[in-house]
Amino acid sequence: MSELLLELFSEEIPAFMQKNAEEAYLNIFTKIFKENEIFAQVQVFVGPRRITLHATNLPKVILPKEEEIKGPSIEAPEIAINGFCKVHNVNKFDLSTKLINKKLYYFFVKKTQAREMKEILPKIIIDAINKYSWIKSMFWGCYKIKWIRPLRNILCIFDGEILPLQFGHLSANNITYGHRLTNNKKLEIIDFENYRNKLLENNVILERLKREEIIKVGLLELANAQNLNIKQDARLIEEVTGLNEFPVVLLGKIPQKFLELPEEVIISVMRKHQKYFCLFDKTGNFAPYFLFVINGRFVNIELILQGNEKVLSARLADALYFYKHDIAKTLESRFSKLESVIFHAKLGSLKEKVDRITDICRYIAPDNIDLIMAARLCKSDLVSDMVGEFPDLQGIMGYYYAKHEGLNEEVAKAIRDHYKPQGLNDNVPSGNATLLALADKLDSLVGLIIVGETPNGSGDPYALRRQALGIIRIIIENKLEINFINLINFAVSLYKVPTNTHLDSVISFFEERAKFYFKNDYDIALINAVLDLNLVDTKFKLDTLKEFLVQDVGKQLLNAYKRVSNIIGNQKITGLVDVSLFSTQYEKELFEVIQIISQQIIAIIANKDYKKALNLLSSLLKPITSFFDNVLVNDSDPKIAQNRLSLLHNTCEVFDKVVKFCRL
């Protein structure tokens, strides 16, 4: 069996795209080989400058074969028979017939010729390369092909020989290149083993997972040597793995003078800008060291270390300057500057947004002075030098500036945490930040829906779906008992637009997001049966109903309801039940039970004891069963028949006072 080696050698491939490309090309080549009846073992490797395919177990020749293709019956219209012949490029007289289920059908035996693998591989490879669509791709020079970055070379060897492959202006050869900085020379390749070994000799580790493991081990060893802990950061490890062909981990030191900066600032500078790893002591305190990964083995490691420390010091010096400049002013003094920052072209400035947030907070908790103060100051750090340079520190810098000027911890924490939760894996805020986060997200969502920015399809440029889920999580996880519809109504009113029109749009949007939130844990029918915008209550109802309906009594009660509901169907039942028209004891018994429990259920629901309410409904089981066993609803007397339908209608209404059984 034969071996194929393909390398697409390019300029630097963005690190965050490499893993997806590796997985995609593995699937693409595996699939396209199978489609061509080539059952090979396929591996794909990706690195900063190359994507490599290694396929083994390839036959030198694909053997000829015969395939019997069924056509139309001999009784089919002539046009259908001629169409079959045209598709398969065959004469009608060359067709054979077979009897299938007492009916004759035309058949055609398709024969394929033997094909040499080296003749069919070029087209297969080009098709596979073109099948993957990068998130972004580019043209370069005057060439007509496009790729993620300019392709510089294609290596393609089949059974030790160069495969005649042409991709755009590039012709395949047997050449690759070593490490860009330390061993950037041409390497002639014979086969895959020779390829991997020569790359390693020239400071290139082919396997992404091997590079990743080297980085993980190096980080851990250097951290342990200093008796420090490294914060796990899978995304950063993946990124530096994609930046380095031959990773080497080093330890650097942070000058003491920069430790007066908040640790979040130092971490942001190191992680986001320098791709460095942070270290902490055994008690969790930030340590004045950092770990970083260099690309290759170099003689003068000390010079590289000094260079990285110097670059980090320069960035931290800028951050320290921004910090000292910022703390010279109060958050309140920055408030007026928000007037010059646009929140949205149709919704005014950030100052106007802050005014609305403050009004919402005052509406929710009019006596909470700390909350109202935090609301007024929550966006002031956005016009600070530090947040201007490091946007990911919004809220965090507001916390430190608030603490520096002597504001209390509750105000500072609310400013810091009011952006939470930022995604499904983030915690919801607590304390005053709970209501401030709710107000901020609600104002954004209401305003953007009013001006027509409601998400369509997969597009959601303002992350309104995420903001709605954030609001839902804040309410449920903090068990906030608020009248949410009234709150939405108030938030809409702050925009001085017709309330009713936009209120319905906002409520509808929230209901859809609530369904999305609950659907992971509950059946959609249960959600539809209980959903309203009292979200804490909805969650409690769902838990209670889910538990009840798996019990025998719950199943029996649901079946009883459906039996009653099916009799009524789509008929519009009007009129009260007339007890004088009862002709059986079973009608009377059902009516009496309904009368008794109907009033009781109202009181029980008011106390939110849904389990008790469902158990009370189960007292209807016996009279409903007796009614259907002994009473014919469609009596010959239309008045009696109508009265019995009214009785069943009342029965359904009692059920629906607890939950909407009609949606189950």
UniProtKB/Swiss-Prot annotation:
Any one GO BP annotation for this protein: glycyl-tRNA aminoacylation
Alphabetically ordered keywords of this record: Aminoacyl-tRNA synthetase, ATP-binding, Cytoplasm, Ligase, Nucleotide-binding, Protein biosynthesis
Coiled coil location: none
Keyword Protein transport: no
Subcellular location: Cytoplasm
EC id: 6.1.1.14
Catalytic reaction annotation: tRNA(Gly) + glycine + ATP = glycyl-tRNA(Gly) + AMP + diphosphate
Primary localization class, coarse: cytoplasm
Lineage top rank: taxon: Bacteria
Gene Ontology cellular component terms for the protein in this record: cytosol
Broad class of enzyme this protein falls into: ligase
Keyword Ribosomal protein: no
GO molecular function: arginine-tRNA ligase activity; ATP binding; glycine-tRNA ligase activity
Family stated for the protein in its record: Belongs to the class-II aminoacyl-tRNA synthetase family.
NCBIfam families documented for this protein: glyS
PANTHER family (alphabetical): GLYCINE--TRNA LIGASE, CHLOROPLASTIC_MITOCHONDRIAL 2 (PTHR30075:SF2), GLYCYL-TRNA SYNTHETASE (PTHR30075)
Assembly and oligomerization: Tetramer of two alpha and two beta subunits.
Protein name as catalogued: Glycine--tRNA ligase beta subunit
Source organism of this protein record: Rickettsia typhi (strain ATCC VR-144 / Wilmington)
